[in-house]
C-alpha cells in the first residue's frame, strides 16, 4: 500500500464515519420528536456505515499485522479519529433514545 492508497483509505473512513454521524444526529432529533421508529431505523443505518468504515480499517490493520510496512497518513489518522468518535456517539445516542422512550411512556 502506497501513501496515496493510504490517504484514499483515510478519506473512505472519514466518509463512512461522517455519514454515520449525520444519521445518528438525525436519529436523536427524531427521538426528541417522538418518532422512535425513525430513530431506531437511522441508528441501524448508522451501524451499517460504521461497519463499512470498520471493514476498511480492519483490512489495513491486517496488512500491517502481516508485516507490511504502511506509510503514515494524516488523512488516515483523521479517519481513525472520526471513526472512534462516531462509535462513541452511537453508544451515547442509543442511551439517549432509550431515555426519550422511557419519558414518552
Curated annotation (Swiss-Prot):
Phosphohistidine PTM positions: 78
Q: Which residues form the active site?
A: 78
Induction notes from the record: By lactose. The operon consists of lacABCDFEGX. A second transcript of only lacF and lacE is also lactose-induced.
The protein's location, in the record's own words, is: Cytoplasm
**What GO terms in the biological process aspect are recorded for it?**
phosphoenolpyruvate-dependent sugar phosphotransferase system
**Cofactor needs:** Mg(2+)
Per the entry, the cofactor note is:
Binds 1 Mg(2+) ion per trimer.
| The UniProt record lists the keyword Metal-binding | yes
What domain of life does the native source organism fall in? Bacteria
A Pfam match: PTS_IIA
Give UniProt keywords alphabetically.
Cytoplasm, Magnesium, Metal-binding, Phosphoprotein, Phosphotransferase system, Plasmid, Sugar transport, Transferase, Transport
Q: Which GO terms describe its cellular component?
A: cytoplasm
Ligand binding (Mg(2+)): 81
According to the entry, every stretch annotated as the PTS EIIA type-3 domain falls at: 4-102
* GO molecular function terms attached to this record: metal ion binding; transferase activity
The miscellaneous comment for this protein is: This gene was sequenced from pMG820, a laboratory-derived deletion of the naturally occurring plasmid pLP712.
Domain characteristics, as noted in the entry: The PTS EIIA type-3 domain is phosphorylated by phospho-HPr on a histidyl residue. Then, it transfers the phosphoryl group to the PTS EIIB type-3 domain.
Self-association and partners:
Homotrimer.
Function according to Swiss-Prot or TrEMBL = The phosphoenolpyruvate-dependent sugar phosphotransferase system (sugar PTS), a major carbohydrate active transport system, catalyzes the phosphorylation of incoming sugar substrates concomitantly with their translocation across the cell membrane. The enzyme II LacEF PTS system is involved in lactose transport.
Q: What protein am I looking at? A: PTS system lactose-specific EIIA component
Q: What is the taxonomic lineage of the source species?
A: Bacteria, Bacillati, Bacillota, Bacilli, Lactobacillales
Q: Which gene encodes it?
A: lacF
Amino acid at each position: 500500500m502506497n501513501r496515496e492508497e493510504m490517504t484514499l483509505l483515510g478519506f473512505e473512513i472519514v466518509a463512512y464515519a461522517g455519514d454515520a454521524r449525520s444519521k445518528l444526529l438525525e436519529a436523536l432529533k427524531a427521538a426528541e420528536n417522538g418518532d422512535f421508529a425513525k430513530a431506531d431505523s437511522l441508528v441501524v443505518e448508522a451501524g451499517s456505515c460504521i461497519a463499512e468504515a470498520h471493514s476498511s480499517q480492519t483490512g489495513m490493520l491486517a496488512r500491517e499485522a502481516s508485516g507490511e510496512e504502511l506509510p503514515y497518513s494524516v488523512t488516515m489518522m483523521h479517519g481513525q479519529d472520526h471513526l472512534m468518535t462516531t462509535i462513541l456517539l452511537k453508544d451515547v445516542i442509543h442511551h439517549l433514545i432509550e431515555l426519550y422512550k422511557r419519558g414518552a411512556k
